[in-house]
């Protein structure tokens, strides 16, 4: 007899209903709905609870049709069955079906009514929920709290306050919800009154008050609450940390982060973001590297802070590492990397990101299209940018401005003007301030002065756009490039606002081109008053002094820079080779692994340049070195190093793309023109101002830059 019992216990396929219900619920929760159904079908004896569990399982796995089919097959139903059907439909967004079931119910209790009210609240139909709520024959704590939360979610704080006062028996959830809602609306003191009235507070209540203070710029009050909390969870610590980060108190956040007993992912992400805002990128990277686990937001945040703080190469390396580790980039991450690719002129990686956006069907979005256009423009692929532009029948202002700016930066003034003229005819978009900056820049770069003057005159009279300093800067730049200094000064004198650094900088740049030293000194004085720490002004004026042999003035400027702790921005150039971006600084190849090969290319180019009649321009070089050293130093400029490395590594016929953070120097411009001819290579150089397309010894700028 005992052995038979043991045998049945071991091998019986029938699971007692209570145990089966638990397992059905568990399997449903972890997504194994088909296994749950097999278990349900294997039960010889099914209770109403078994049927209810299986129906709930289908709803939990977003299978409302299967749930309803099983419900209709139930031999017996109780009110729990009906309530489960109403609640399940609501959770699946099937509001109308839920209401039909509710109306058909043979009997209803407070749970039935509450389920329907909660469903309407959950689906954003608070007005309908409110109407039902007041019709309820009876209400319990849950009913009141559900309606309260509905008002709060809908931003109806005053209605929530009135309802809160009517609740006969306020529980912890209702009070905490009210605290959260008031804090969200900035009514922190009222929230604190409710908090102080509570005889018992859960850790959630304490944390809600801490969060509320933090979100309302009262982080010191948040800390006082935090310090007296009877217990703290990971969420409590994280809320306090985020309060510090959101209020820019990064040092306090660092101190708190160090003593946190557990550092959850969300806390680490907040710390990375905070350190990034402060520019502490190395510290942020250490936090990221120390994380035992990371989520999508971790990668997104660390990539974003590197991109925003000018560490584009590191951001790109992180993106590559992310993909190697099998993490799929989120949409914001892809957008950040597109900006990185644009900054670095990394066409290969930009195309990869474009492909990912296409696979996810994000490329149909107008915003994404404008970001892609910008990336291709800055990588020198203007044709691909125009293809994206033409693909959209309905274009927003950003797309129009992007393509006009693209033509401007490539020196294609006529094409830019053509698009500008098409814009009003499209009927949907009117030119704005940015449009005119782009169009006037196009005229300036292309030397189309008369056309630029006409567009400037039409801004306010035809399009109703009042000139701002950016437009004046474009006009001064355009007139100055053309050598029309009197008109440029008249333009400045006519300004209704105070000229800014962009205006004086435009005129100073023109002075360099036309060797107008007297005007340059006047402009530099104005610029130093506005931006005393900007090294560009000192360097440009110093170069002009050097070109005229005024070495005493050069020394005086150097002394002034030293006194004011002004440091020259180092020139840096990038080129993409074998799907990797390589950076070069002036003279900076001593530590390069391919130093010898690069030096050989430089020597070869030096010989070819001399044979082609190249005459080095040493006019801006320092006077305290001999002529041979001056000439030798020129070939180690960052843009020359990048071109040399690209020639070394890229196959014949492949265009060379180089990006420089500063304006290309006149000597390198001349040298690269000749290199493009003697090496029969197209070289695309993007400097701080514009693109230079070198081909067969000519530049697209026509030496008008």
Swiss-Prot record:
One of its GO terms (cellular component) is mitochondrion. PPR repeats lie at residues 16-46, 47-77, 78-112, 113-139, 140-170, 171-205, 206-232, 233-267, 268-294, 295-329, 330-364, 365-395, 396-430, 432-462, 468-498. Residues 579-610 are annotated as: Type E(+) motif. Keywords: Mitochondrion, Repeat, Transit peptide. Disulfide bonds: none annotated. One of its GO terms (biological process) is RNA modification. GO terms for molecular function: RNA binding; zinc ion binding. Transmembrane segments: none annotated. Residues 611-705 are annotated as: Type DYW motif. Residues 503-578 are annotated as: Type E motif. Belongs to the PPR family. PCMP-H subfamily. This is Pentatricopeptide repeat-containing protein At1g09410, mitochondrial. It comes from Arabidopsis thaliana (Mouse-ear cress).
């Amino acid at each position: 007899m005992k052995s038979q019992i043991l045998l049945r216990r071991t091998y019986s396929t029938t699971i007692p209903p209570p145990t089966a219900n638990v397992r059905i619920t568990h399997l449903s929760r972890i997504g194994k709905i088909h296994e749950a159904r097999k278990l349900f079908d294997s039960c010889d004896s099914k209770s109403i609870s078994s049927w209810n569990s299986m129906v709930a399982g289908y709803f939990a796995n977003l299978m409302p049709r299967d749930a309803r089919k099983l419900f209709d097959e139930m031999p017996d139903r109780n009110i729990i069955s009906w309530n489960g059907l109403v609640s399940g439909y609501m959770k699946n967004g099937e509001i109308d079906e839920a209401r039909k079931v509710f109306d058909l119910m043979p009997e209803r209790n407070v749970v039935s009514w509450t389920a329907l009210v909660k469903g309407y609240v959950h689906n954003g139909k608070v007005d309908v929920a409110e109407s039902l709520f007041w019709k309820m024959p009876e209400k319990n704590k849950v009913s009141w709290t559900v309606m309260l939360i509905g008002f709060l979610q809908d931003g109806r704080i005053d209605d929530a306050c009135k309802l809160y006062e009517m609740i006969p028996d306020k529980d912890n959830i209702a009070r905490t919800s009210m605290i959260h809602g008031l804090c969200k609306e900035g009514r922190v003191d009222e929230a604190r009154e409710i908090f102080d009235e509570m005889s018992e507070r859960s850790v959630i209540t304490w944390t809600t008050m801490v969060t509320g203070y933090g979100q309302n710029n009262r982080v010191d009050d948040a800390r006082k609450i935090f310090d007296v909390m009877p217990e703290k969870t990971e969420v409590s610590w994280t809320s306090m940390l985020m309060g510090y980060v959101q209020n820019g108190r990064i040092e306090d956040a660092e101190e708190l982060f160090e003593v946190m007993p557990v550092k959850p992912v969300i806390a680490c992400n907040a710390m990375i973001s905070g350190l990034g805002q402060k520019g502490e990128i190395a510290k942020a990277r250490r936090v990221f590297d120390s994380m035992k686990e990371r989520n999508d937001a971790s990668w997104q945040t660390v990539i974003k802070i590197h991109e925003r703080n000018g560490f584009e190469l590191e951001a790109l390396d992180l993106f590559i590492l992310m993909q190697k580790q099998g993490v799929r980039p989120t949409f914001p991450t892809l957008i950040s990397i597109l900006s990185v690719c644009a900054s670095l002129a990394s066409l290969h990686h930009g195309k990869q990101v474009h492909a990912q956006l296409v696979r996810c069907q994000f490329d149909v979005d107008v915003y994404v299209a404008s970001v892609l256009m910008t990336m291709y423009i800055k990588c020198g692929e203007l044709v691909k940018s125009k293809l994206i532009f033409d693909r959209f029948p309905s274009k927003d202002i950003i797309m129009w401005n992007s393509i006009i700016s693209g033509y401007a930066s490539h020196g294609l003034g006529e094409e830019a003007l053509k698009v500008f003229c098409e814009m009003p005819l499209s009927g949907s978009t009117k030119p704005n301030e940015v449009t005119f900056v782009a169009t006037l820049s196009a005229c300036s770069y292309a030397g189309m002065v008369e056309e630029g003057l006409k567009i400037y005159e039409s801004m306010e009279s035809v399009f109703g756009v009042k000139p701002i300093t950016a437009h004046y800067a474009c006009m001064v730049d355009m007139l100055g490039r053309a050598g029309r200094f009197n008109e440029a000064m008249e333009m400045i004198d006519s300004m209704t606002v105070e000229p800014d650094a962009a205006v004086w900088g435009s005129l100073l740049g023109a002075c360099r081109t036309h060797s107008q030293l007297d005007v340059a000194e006047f402009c530099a004085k104005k610029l130093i008053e506005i931006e005393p720490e900007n090294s560009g002004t000192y360097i440009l004026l110093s170069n002009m002094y050097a070109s005229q042999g005024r070495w005493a003035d050069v020394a005086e400027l150097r002394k002034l820079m030293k006194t004011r702790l002004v440091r020259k921005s180092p020139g840096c150039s990038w080129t993409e080779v074998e799907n990797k971006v390589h950076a070069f600084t002036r003279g900076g190849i001593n530590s390069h692994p391919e130093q010898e090969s690069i030096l050989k290319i430089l020597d070869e180019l030096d010989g070819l340049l001399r044979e082609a009649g190249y005459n080095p321009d040493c006019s801006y070089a320092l006077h305290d070195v001999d002529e041979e050293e001056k000439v030798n130093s020129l070939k180690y400029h960052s843009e020359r190093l990048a071109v040399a490395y690209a020639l070394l590594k890229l196959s014949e016929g492949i265009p060379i793309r180089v990006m420089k953070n500063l304006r290309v120097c006149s000597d390198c411009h001349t040298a690269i023109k000749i290199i493009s001819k003697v090496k029969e290579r197209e070289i695309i150089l993007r400097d701080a101002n514009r693109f230079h397309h070198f081909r067969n010894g000519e530049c697209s700028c026509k030496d008008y830059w």
